[in-house]
């Protein structure tokens, strides 16, 4: 692990070597906007903003990307809910349960699955207000997701409205699926078969499919 010092909280970013090519730009962009976004109480807390940068990228095949953290109780790990109360991760777990037949589980975490990096496009929001920090993170968000897509085969974005123009923001060619948000109305996410489709796409690319059942916590 490497670390770099920044002028504002969290003051230090610890990161895996795979993120090195974007770190100097990240530090520059963050120092420009940090004083604005830190005026708010945030979800997650600043110490958790950059926690996913500890993840290597070279062993990842899929990025599962949400728009921003939970408006309360964000952990810095996208979709993570230690007490398994958040609708998004419960819906994701139900979808994987239908796909895999696993039913007796107490939780689900995308961050423990081989080959998968869960990501949030914006790394924080004002406590209780989703997408409230979009304007501050925009340059950083584009920089970091762009970097991730250089390593993965499939980018799966959850939210048809939020990610409607995501392909235009990315320069590297990556297979992109834009699916329904897990909290979408009318049970649209239930009918979405993206997790299956991702594995078909990986096989077509001669990559190992994802074992989605690995995310279950018992």
Swiss-Prot record:
Gene3D superfamilies: Uracil-DNA glycosylase-like domain. GO terms for molecular function: DNA binding; hydrolase activity, hydrolyzing N-glycosyl compounds. Its EC number is 3.2.2.27. It is an enzyme of class 3 (hydrolase). Keywords: DNA damage, DNA repair, DNA-binding, Hydrolase. The keyword DNA repair applies. It comes from the Viruses. One of its GO terms (biological process) is DNA repair. The keyword rRNA-binding does not apply. It catalyses: Hydrolyzes single-stranded DNA or mismatched double-stranded DNA and polynucleotides, releasing free uracil. Homodimer. Interacts with protein OPG148. Component of the Uracil-DNA glycosylase(UDG)-OPG148-polymerase complex; OPG148 and UDG form a heterodimeric processivity factor that associates with OPG71 to form the processive polymerase holoenzyme. Belongs to the uracil-DNA glycosylase (UDG) superfamily. UNG family. Plays an essential role in viral replication as a component of the DNA polymerase processivity factor. Excises uracil residues from the DNA which can arise as a result of misincorporation of dUMP residues by DNA polymerase or due to deamination of cytosine. This is Uracil-DNA glycosylase. It comes from Monkeypox virus.
């Amino acid at each position: 692990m490497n670390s770099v010092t920044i002028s504002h909280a969290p003051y230090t970013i610890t990161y895996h070597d795979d993120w090195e090519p974007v770190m100097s730009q990240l530090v520059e962009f963050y120092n420009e906007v940090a004083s604005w976004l830190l005026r708010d109480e945030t979800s997650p807390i600043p110490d958790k903003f950059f926690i996913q940068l500890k993840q290597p990228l070279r062993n990842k095949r899929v990025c599962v990307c949400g728009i921003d953290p939970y408006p309360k109780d964000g952990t810095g790990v996208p979709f993570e809910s230690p007490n398994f109360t958040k609708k998004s991760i419960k819906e994701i777990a139900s979808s994987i349960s239908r796909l895999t037949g696993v039913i007796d589980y107490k939780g689900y975490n995308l961050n423990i699955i081989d080959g998968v990096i869960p990501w949030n496009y914006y790394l924080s929001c004002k406590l209780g207000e989703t997408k409230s920090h979009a304007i501050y993170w925009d340059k950083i968000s584009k920089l970091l997701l762009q970097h991730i897509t250089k390593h993965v085969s499939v980018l799966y974005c959850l939210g048809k409205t939020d990610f409607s123009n995501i392909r235009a923001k990315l320069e590297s060619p990556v297979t992109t699926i834009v699916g329904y948000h897990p909290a979408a109305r009318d049970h649209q996410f239930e009918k979405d078969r993206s997790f299956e489709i991702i594995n078909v796409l990986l096989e077509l690319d001669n990559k190992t499919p994802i074992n989605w059942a690995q995310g279950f916590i018992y």
